């Protein structure tokens, strides 16, 4: 049997491999240790931040739930603002807001409440809800613009910018006489047509109109009674482009006259019957 070859090794030389110190090895060790320390601090900071955020959310949720189940969250008072001509109590009933309702729930249902009130009251364009204090609910009503008034029996009603009529009946002294009065309109279609044309007039001209009469000979005819006592007769298709000549035409008039703008433009004095019919006598 062949003998194995044995190689002799110096023990000191073998041990020196483990004890030998290479230059720069300590610096790398310290650098690695420093990085580990910084990483631990960063992780600890991130963990504390996340825990703080979770605790804050939990505290807010607890506070909200505590408020929500308490009587402080119940509607105590509803104040109706911006609708002086409408009955505030009736509006609250239509909105179906009760003292037992939660303020938060009412605010969340604002769009639904606004639609209910607009459907019931033509004057209402929209409603905005807000809270004053802890549980006082403010209902801010945004009303539609009033373009004029129409005679309804012995009283008057508002004509809104969209052509709808207001719900409340007004006495002669209660409406704004700076806005025109629409008389003798038996058909809603004719009223809306003339209102649309009137709203398209220049602002300076609209301020001069006292009354619009629906007592016309033709569907395409439009009659305007002016505040200065003159009467304009025009065609619904062309009158918008012709009213700009009114101020220059009236300067040549010596008496209250009819200014016919249906075909061209000519003038004649008002008859006694016409003055009486238009309330100018």
Curated annotation (Swiss-Prot):
**UniProt topological domain (Cytoplasmic) ranges:** 1-46
Gene Ontology BP term (one): FtsZ-dependent cytokinesis
**Gene3D superfamilies, sorted:** 3.40.50.10960
Tell me what topology the record assigns in the membrane: Single-pass type II membrane protein
Mapped to this chain, the residue ranges on the Extracellular side of the membrane are: 70-281
Chief location: membrane
Query: What range(s) does the POTRA domain occupy?
Result: 73-144
> Where in the chain are disulfide-linked cysteines found?
none
An annotated GO cellular component of this protein is: plasma membrane
Q: Where in the cell is it found?
A: Cell membrane
What keywords sit in the KW lines? Cell cycle, Cell division, Cell membrane, Membrane, Transmembrane, Transmembrane helix
Bias class Basic and acidic residues marks the residues at 8-31
Q: Which residues cross the membrane?
A: 47-69
Give the domain of life. Answer: Bacteria
What sections of the sequence does the record tag as coiled-coil? none
User: Region Disordered: start and end of each range?
Assistant: 1-36
The record's family statement is: Belongs to the FtsQ/DivIB family. DivIB subfamily.
Biological role: Cell division protein that may be involved in stabilizing or promoting the assembly of the division complex.
Q: Which HAMAP family match?
A: DivIB
Q: What is this protein called?
A: Cell division protein DivIB
What gene name is listed for this protein?
divIB
């Amino acid at each position: 049997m062949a003998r194995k070859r044995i190689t002799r090794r110096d023990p000191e030389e073998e041990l020196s491999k483990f004890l030998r110190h290479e230059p720069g090895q300590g610096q790398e060790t310290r650098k690695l240790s420093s990085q580990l320390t910084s990483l631990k601090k960063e992780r600890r900071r991130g963990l504390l931040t996340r825990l703080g955020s979770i605790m804050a959310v939990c505290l807010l949720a607890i506070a909200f739930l505590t408020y929500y189940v308490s009587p402080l969250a119940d509607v105590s008072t509803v104040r109706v603002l911006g609708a002086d001509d409408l009955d505030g109590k009736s509006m609250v009933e239509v909105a179906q807001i009760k003292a037992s309702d939660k303020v938060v729930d009412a605010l969340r249902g604002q769009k639904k409440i606004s639609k209910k009130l607009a459907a019931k009251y033509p004057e209402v364009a929209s409603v905005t809800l807000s809270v004053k204090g802890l549980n006082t609910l403010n209902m801010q009503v945004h009303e539609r613009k009033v373009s004029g008034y129409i005679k309804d029996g012995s009283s008057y009603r508002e004509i809104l910018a969209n052509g709808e009529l207001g719900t409340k009946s007004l006495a002669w002294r209660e409406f704004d006489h700076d806005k025109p009065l629409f008389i003798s309109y038996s058909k809603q279609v004719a009223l809306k047509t003339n209102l649309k044309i009137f709203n398209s007039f220049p602002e300076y001209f609209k301020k001069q109109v006292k009354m619009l009469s629906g007592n016309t000979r033709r569907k395409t005819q439009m009659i305007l009674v002016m505040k200065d006592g003159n009467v304009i007769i025009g065609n619904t298709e062309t009158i918008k482009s012709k009213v700009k000549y009114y101020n220059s035409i009236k300067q040549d008039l010596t008496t209250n006259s009819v200014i016919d703008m249906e075909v061209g433009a000519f003038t004649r004095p008002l008859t006694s019957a016409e003055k009486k019919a238009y309330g100018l006598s």
